[in-house]
Regions:
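N-terminal accessory interaction module
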Residues: 1-75
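N-terminal pre-Walker A segment at the start of P-loop NTPase domains
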Residues: 70-104
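Walker A/P-loop nucleotide-binding motif
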Residues: 103-123
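AAA+/P-loop NTPase substrate/partner-engagement loops
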Residues: 129-167, 175-180
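Short glycine-/polar-rich loops that comprise or flank the Walker A/P-loop
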Residues: 139-141, 165-167, 193-194, 219-222, ...
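Conserved catalytic/switch belt of AAA+ P-loop NTPases
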Residues: 179-219, 226-228
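A short helix-turn-beta junction within AAA+ P-loop NTPase domains corresponding to the substrate/partner-engaging
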Residues: 236-257
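Conserved AAA+ ATPase small/helical "lid" subdomain
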Residues: 263, 270-330
């Protein structure tokens, strides 16, 4: 595949036409004219900041680009604004997908991202709003968040409890179900693409008899898995398990992989009002963010949770919160 240098051309990034003049891309297909005008097709995944697929660069003709076989592919860095917009879009999409899961349009979803960036908050916010009517009507909740370890029989019973349509089970950092083969087989049956999803427990169990759970039932609910695991980077036997589950789920990677992206996510959430309940002066808001940013390499965890810890200290110890934070949230 030859490289080409764009002499004159644009591509929409976050809804804005970005001038790509001078940038080098691998050529996929020569100039063509489509319904929206002329374009040349290049490999976007080769250049950072572009979609992981072929993209169409708008141009007027083949004269708007030239052969650049000996040139290096352009290394383009996202601006802070572009990164914040990308992350905001991802989290908005997470909320949209959660609504679709609640309605039953999406059977299952895996949400992958580092700890403390707001994965669980976005999911629970949407489900909590939908569940308000059930609470007001004194009806059983239609969703539950499961955390920690879970056995196969515990999983079977939980799925039975939320087997009805419009019910959702959220597995939040409950990664033990991914490693256990029996749990995985139960989940594969529950999330199968067939019209009828029937789950069976074929061994005698006192627990099932005691709780009135049948040895088979039809599962019509949905599931959301919130995890810190990167499925595509997993290795060994667990990779086979994760791939089997991923094939039955929509996979949402929040694309927060670097310290810079985590820090920009923190700045975005704070600017959106995360600390408003503390009623701090705007100057103190900025001091807290600056403290996190300056010391990010030494923090025990760069996350929204750490921001809240520092805010708690600023409220409790207005005159010495920085000294307190240095001793509680930073590595020694």
């Amino acid at each position: 595949m030859n490289n080409i240098r764009i002499l004159q051309g644009t591509y929409k990034i976050r809804g804005k036409d970005v001038d790509l003049s001078g940038m080098v891309f691998p050529l996929v297909e020569e100039f063509k004219v489509g319904a929206k005008g002329g374009y040349v097709t290049v490999d976007g995944k080769a250049v950072a900041g572009f979609p992981d697929r072929n993209i169409k660069i708008a141009c007027n003709g083949a004269a708007d680009y030239e052969d650049a076989s000996g040139a290096q592919i352009t290394k383009r860095e996202e601006t802070d604004e572009e990164t914040i917009d990308r992350l905001r879009e991802r989290f908005d999409m997470l909320e949209d997908m959660t609504r679709a899961t609640k309605k039953g349009d999406v059977r299952a979803m895996i949400v992958s991202g580092p700890p403390g960036v707001g994965k669980s908050f976005g999911v629970e916010k949407v489900l909590g709003k939908h569940d308000l009517i059930a609470q007001l009507g004194d009806r059983p909740a239609k969703y539950e968040v499961v955390k920690g370890a879970m056995s196969a029989i515990g999983l079977y019973c939980k799925l039975y409890k939320f087997a009805d349509k419009d019910n959702v089970i959220v597995f939040d950092d409950c990664d033990s179900v991914f490693a256990d083969e029996l749990c995985l087989n139960i989940l594969k049956a529950a999330l199968d693409s067939k019209k009828t999803r029937r789950i069976h427990w074929n061994t005698d169990s006192f627990k099932l008899r005691n709780e009135g759970v049948p040895d088979s039932f039809e599962f019509k609910g949905s599931a959301i898995f919130i995890t810190n695991l990167k499925f595509d980077k997993s290795k060994g036997k667990i990779r086979e398990h994760l791939m089997a589950l991923e094939s039955r789920c929509h996979y949402v990677d929040l694309t927060i992989d670097t310290e810079r992206e985590k820090m920009l996510r923190i700045k975005q959430i704070v600017s959106d009002g995360m600390l408003s309940e503390y009623k701090f002066a705007e100057e103190l808001h900025q001091e807290i963010i600056d403290f996190i940013d300056i010391n990010k390499a030494r923090l025990r965890e760069l996350s929204l949770r750490t921001v809240l810890k520092v805010a708690d200290l600023a409220k409790a110890f207005p005159m010495k919160w920085e000294a307190m934070a240095e001793n509680t949230v930073m590595k020694r």
